[in-house]
């Protein structure tokens, strides 16, 4: 039997894993700093066949952390937990973004996401398979996934030129 704390953790993981991304007036996702995991959906959380976990934390979130050498390379690991008896497939994708500069005053940020064109490579560490960024996890299985997210030289230059003291990537 699960404890109240364990049930609370799983409820948060289910809600975060199944939230809907909120888009701004330009049709781009709001920054994670503004929307968190997105708009929670009780329907999605109750009906999902899988959810995400991250080792070492109770929430289903990844943090890219600081990149002091400005390499533009970020590594993330997470687990895909299959609650069902059936084999499931999920296509991995990434929406990378940073801050944009105000068009009326370059001294300020616009508080609007600047989407980044970049690349990522995914690999299975344990418990599943991957082909062309489609992850397969067996029924009632757990698949540990590692994603390496790399900014293009163009995006690194954009961030450097716009924010010489650095800026977040999410």
What are these regions (language model features)?
Residues 1-26, 169:
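Hydrolase catalytic cores
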Residues 42-85, 93, 132-135:
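Beta-sheet-dominated interaction scaffolds and their linkers
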Residues 70-77, 156-170:
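Short, solvent-exposed loop/turn segments enriched in Ser/Thr/Gly
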Residues 82-86, 98, 153:
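Short, acidic/polar linear motifs in exposed loop/turn regions
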Residues 105-161:
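Intrinsically disordered, low-complexity Pro/Gly/Ser/Thr-rich segments with frequent PxxP/GP/PP motifs
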């Amino acid at each position: 039997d699960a404890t109240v704390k364990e049930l609370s953790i799983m409820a948060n993981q289910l809600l975060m894993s199944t939230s809907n991304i909120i888009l701004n007036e330009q049709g781009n996702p709001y920054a994670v700093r503004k929307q968190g995991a997105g708009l929670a959906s009780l329907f999605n959380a109750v009906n999902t066949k899988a959810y995400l976990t991250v080792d070492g934390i109770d929430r289903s979130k990844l943090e890219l952390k600081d990149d002091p050498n400005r390499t533009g390379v970020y590594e993330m690991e997470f687990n895909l937990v299959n609650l069902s008896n059936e084999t499931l497939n999920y296509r991995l994708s990434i929406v990378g973004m940073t801050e944009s500069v105000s068009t009326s005053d370059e001294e300020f940020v616009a508080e609007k996401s600047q989407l980044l064109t970049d690349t990522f490579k995914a690999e299975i560490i344990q418990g599943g398979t991957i082909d062309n960024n489609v992850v397969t996890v067996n029924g009632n299985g757990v698949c540990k996934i590692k994603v390496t997210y790399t900014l293009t030289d163009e995006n690194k230059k954009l961030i450097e030129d716009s924010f010489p003291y650095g800026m977040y990537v999410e």
